[in-house]
Amino acid sequence: MISMMSLDSTQSTGAFLDGQLLIAMPNMVDNRFARSVIYLCAHSEEGAMGIVLNRAARKINFPQLLVQLEVIGADEAIRLPNSAETMQVLNGGPVETGRGFVLHSDDFFIDNSTLPIDGGVSLTATIDILRAIAKGSGPHQAILALGYAGWSAGQLEEEIQHNGWLNCPADPSLIFDDALGSKYERALRKVGIDPGYLSSEAGHA
């Protein structure tokens, strides 16, 4: 059963990378993250958590998910607003794949549930946001991810140091773009890198 979850509202400070994009480098040895673009939702001394932005979830779409979670009845799926019918459902990462996370624009907020991140992007992981989207009263922009990418204390820093990831400021237009197949190349180009010339020796943007 897929479920939503509560969020820890503690945000990191200082030289952490919350609100930035992680772009996998060509030497990424973990096939789960090869050519992935990840939005980093939280980063602190205790570890990091992010959502993969360019991999679609298999075997389920948003209307089906709403029915499964009993947000709507099966007969109501045909009456959803267009924004709900077409909303992306992503494979957000390999951790807790039965949990749902909604990345969205900051025009929507639920007390004690929504975590503002950076640059007009927030994260909500309770079923209330799904109800709002189903009614057409949700955020202007949103994507739903099942699962997330997680790192233990110091793990992400070590991977970046060993050129596993490129990090750069996030762009909401890229986060919420539904052209998943070209998102990796476009993320690289946004930091001035031609994907055809990128090598495993490249540094940070």
Swiss-Prot record:
One of its GO terms (cellular component) is cytosol. It holds the Pfam family DUF179. It comes from the Bacteria. Disulfide bonds: none annotated. Transmembrane segments: none annotated. InterPro entries: AlgH-like. PANTHER family: UNCHARACTERIZED PROTEIN YQGE, UPF0301 PROTEIN YQGE. This is UPF0301 protein Bind_0718.
